[in-house]
């Protein structure tokens, strides 16, 4: 691949092969260990170079969110781990009705422990994404997001937010702005949504994503 250093080419090739094998992107430490690179900061530097040269896209606040650009997305051949319940669909767009609870879920997804980092799989659930409001965060229609059960979130974190008076839920970045909440899409064509802070309930924070490669 022209314009890349030898190290950048090796990192790119490793990412592609890792996605083919596992169905999700490697963490920085995976790359460092496998390619015997001196430090994670060196890996991060080369990932920034790959991104600036237009070969990958990254979403910094989500574990393992690396996407190959202008390349055939490799299909996973192996995906091991434990099952996490898929509780329903979440809107990446306008809010939709709250998904069913886990007691009524007959759907699940096989998730490697590594994909959620330090989060225990028992504290994690999954939702299928409907819509395109988070495409600039590398989350597209048909992807599955993994969320950690929690009722609080910091500014800028991606969450499942329930609009209480409408009993609907949406996937957005959350920002607390005094007595109101801004739910911000990651799509330049869409506008933020604003609600009174008392009308918004955090139902989970996004900790990973499984891409729909079909």
Curated annotation (Swiss-Prot):
EC number: 3.4.21.88
Molecular function GO terms recorded: DNA binding; serine-type endopeptidase activity
UniProt keyword annotation of Transcription regulation present: yes
GO biological process terms, semicolon-separated: DNA repair; DNA replication; negative regulation of DNA-templated transcription; proteolysis; SOS response
Catalytic residues (positions): 133, 172
Catalyzed chemical reaction(s): Hydrolysis of Ala-|-Gly bond in repressor LexA
Marked site positions, Cleavage: 92-93
DNA bind region: 28-48
Signal peptide: none
Transmembrane annotation, as ranges: none
InterPro entries per record: LexA, LexA-like, LexA/Signal_pep-like_sf, LexA_DNA-bd_dom, LexA_repressor, Peptidase_S24_LexA, Peptidase_S24_S26A/B/C, WH-like_DNA-bd_sf
Gene3D superfamilies named in the record: Umud Fragment, subunit A, Winged helix-like DNA-binding domain superfamily/Winged helix DNA-binding domain
Keyword Aminoacyl-tRNA synthetase: no
Keyword tags: Autocatalytic cleavage, DNA damage, DNA repair, DNA replication, DNA-binding, Hydrolase, Repressor, SOS response, Transcription, Transcription regulation
Listed Pfam families: LexA_DNA_bind (PF01726), Peptidase_S24 (PF00717)
Coiled coil: none
Family the entry assigns: Belongs to the peptidase S24 family.
Subunit (UniProt): Homodimer.
Function: Represses a number of genes involved in the response to DNA damage (SOS response), including recA and lexA. In the presence of single-stranded DNA, RecA interacts with LexA causing an autocatalytic cleavage which disrupts the DNA-binding part of LexA, leading to derepression of the SOS regulon and eventually DNA repair.
Protein's name in the database: LexA repressor
